[in-house]
């Protein structure tokens, strides 16, 4: 009997999903493209840096080594651009970080999706002889 009572009370206090985000009308913003050797992440923010939407190659169903391809970066950027345009975005300033293969593909697909790219800036961090890099691969 006690188990049934516990089950019923748990169902009554079941938490609701978080409320759906309201659409913000942001005509200008920033697109941050982080392209690593393993993945590409596209984050679209307002001018203050608050995240409006994001997408990545892994989020779009690519697994393993396919995440690091230019096509995966293109799909991720298209997805992020579509979400941003639903929030009223028209112009973006692009900031590219990292050495990955999807850098140019992501920028091209942002433009092809209908966003006007006003500037492209490379913000890849360059160490002043910081951490030791990974050893060279011997194949």
Swiss-Prot record:
Endoplasmic reticulum among keywords: no
UniProt xrefs under InterPro entries: Ribosomal_uS11, Ribosomal_uS11_bac-type, Ribosomal_uS11_CS, Ribosomal_uS11_sf
Any single Pfam family the record assigns to this protein: Ribosomal_S11
PANTHER family (alphabetical): 40S RIBOSOMAL PROTEIN S14/30S RIBOSOMAL PROTEIN S11
Record's function text: Located on the platform of the 30S subunit, it bridges several disparate RNA helices of the 16S rRNA. Forms part of the Shine-Dalgarno cleft in the 70S ribosome.
Family the UniProt entry places it in: Belongs to the universal ribosomal protein uS11 family.
Subunit details: Part of the 30S ribosomal subunit. Interacts with proteins S7 and S18. Binds to IF-3.
Name this protein carries in UniProt: Small ribosomal subunit protein uS11
Taxonomic lineage: Bacteria, Bacillati, Chloroflexota, Chloroflexia, Chloroflexales
Gene coding for it: rpsK
């Amino acid at each position: 009997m006690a188990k049934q009572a516990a089950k019923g009370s748990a169902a009554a206090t079941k938490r609701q999903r978080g409320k759906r985000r309201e659409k913000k009308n942001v005509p200008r913003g920033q697109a941050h493209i982080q392209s690593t050797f393993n993945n590409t992440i596209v984050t679209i923010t307002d001018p203050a840096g608050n995240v409006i939407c994001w997408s990545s190659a892994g989020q779009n169903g690519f697994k393993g080594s396919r995440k690091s391809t230019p096509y995966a970066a293109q799909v991720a950027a298209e997805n992020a651009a579509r979400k941003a345009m639903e929030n009223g975005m028209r112009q973006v300033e692009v900031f590219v970080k990292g050495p990955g293969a999807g850098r140019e593909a992501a920028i091209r697909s942002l433009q092809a999706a209908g966003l006007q790219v006003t500037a492209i800036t490379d913000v890849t961090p360059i160490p002043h002889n910081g951490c030791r890099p990974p050893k060279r691969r011997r194949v």
